[in-house]
């Protein structure tokens, strides 16, 4: 069976693993998923991540907790295969008054909404994290 939305699958795996208190989560790997994991690591939402280059590449993400609670309170998919969400540089959203981040796929790579604003580029809003 083919997967319709691999990014939504990644976000759901992270959300589910955090709800049951797992220390890490494993999923099929792709360049886009590695980029998203890199942004989440830079922003401090997850720990280290690694790619196992076996027959099928797998991405393992270490999850973070603070005082027993998951660091990620909310993880939502915005742009999806049935309804893509593209914004210009002036329309980039501010998540929860700047406390959260939006992960944006731009022509300069995958980055946060703040980095995209600083670079002066818009793109596809993949997801929001708070």
Swiss-Prot record:
Q: Entry's PROSITE patterns?
A: RIBOSOMAL_S8
DNA repair as UniProt keyword: no
| GO molecular function annotation | rRNA binding; structural constituent of ribosome
A single Pfam family it belongs to is Ribosomal_S8
Is this entry keyworded Ribosomal protein?
A: yes
State the GO CC annotations.
ribonucleoprotein complex; ribosome
Q: Name one GO biological process term.
A: translation
State the superkingdom.
Answer: Bacteria
| Keywords from the UniProt entry | Ribonucleoprotein, Ribosomal protein, RNA-binding, rRNA-binding
Listed disulfide bonds for this chain? none
Question: From the record, what ranges are coiled-coil?
Answer: none
Question: Which family does the record assign?
Answer: Belongs to the universal ribosomal protein uS8 family.
Q: How does it assemble?
A: Part of the 30S ribosomal subunit. Contacts proteins S5 and S12.
Q: Which purpose does this protein serve, as stated in its record?
A: One of the primary rRNA binding proteins, it binds directly to 16S rRNA central domain where it helps coordinate assembly of the platform of the 30S subunit.
What protein is this chain from? Answer: Small ribosomal subunit protein uS8
Give the source species. Answer: Saccharophagus degradans (strain 2-40 / ATCC 43961 / DSM 17024)
